[in-house]
């Protein structure tokens, strides 16, 4: 998937070597990928069927920002928990899975095929590809899609969404949540206000002060959002 941005979506370049792209707890070696990736239009047909079990392969906070209508939330905090969640389904069921860009689903797809599941479908290119190719009128998507860069969330046509990120807990924030009395820019939000220590709040407040000072002197601060 390719998408354009008017600003630098990442603060800096990082290259890491990891054993797994998305840790799931099982090895994939010399395996032929199942040919069951559906394009957005094919996907719409499959998920509208009553016997299709639609599963969101992402984390709960991503699900809360937006998801497909009638999709199931596995309520996982990391991808290693996903196999255990999948084991509850019957091998004869029609399983349709999706994630942000398709990577997580590729691994889950292989996992289910190895377990003997016959009817498994994944969204080719993930949610990003879907939002880029399906207009809102024909869409089965509800809400926005969380992305792991400075855009925070995107809408149909890959337009930037309305969410921002809390500097205290790094969780996405809606416009409504930012109106809460527990929200303080750069420090905390309703999701972390009651969980942060006084020391953490003090450190975050100092960081926010530095960002404001940098802005006044027209200097770029590494933590300053550019959207």
Task: Label each residue range with its predicted role.
Residues 1-36, 52, 59-95, 103-227:
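Rhodanese-like catalytic fold shared by cysteine-dependent sulfurtransferases
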Residues 35-39, 47:
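A conserved helix-loop-strand patch within extracytoplasmic ligand-binding domains
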């Amino acid at each position: 998937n390719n998408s354009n941005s008017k600003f630098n979506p990442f603060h800096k370049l990082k290259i890491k070597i990891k054993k797994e792209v998305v840790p799931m707890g099982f090895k994939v070696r010399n395996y032929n990928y199942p040919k069951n990736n559906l394009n957005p239009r094919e996907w719409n047909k499959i998920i509208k069927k009553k016997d299709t079990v639609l599963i969101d392969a992402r984390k709960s906070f991503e699900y809360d920002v937006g998801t497909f209508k009638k999709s199931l939330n596995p309520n996982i905090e990391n991808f290693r928990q996903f196999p255990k969640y999948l084991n509850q389904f019957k091998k004869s069921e029609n399983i349709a899975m999706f994630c942000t860009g398709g990577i997580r689903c590729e691994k889950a797809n292989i996992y289910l095929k190895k377990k003997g599941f016959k009817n498994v479908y994944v969204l080719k290119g993930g949610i990003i590809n879907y939002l880029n190719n399906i207009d809102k009128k024909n869409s089965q998507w509800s809400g926005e899609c969380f992305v792991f860069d400075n855009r925070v969330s995107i809408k149909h046509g890959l337009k930037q969404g309305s969410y921002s990120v809390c500097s205290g807990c790094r969780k996405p924030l809606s416009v409504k949540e930012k109106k809460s009395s527990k929200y303080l820019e750069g420090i905390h939000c309703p999701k972390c206000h009651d969980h942060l220590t006084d020391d953490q709040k003090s450190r975050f407040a100092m960081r926010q002060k530095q960002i404001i000072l940098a802005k006044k002197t027209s200097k770029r601060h590494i933590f300053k959002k550019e959207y």
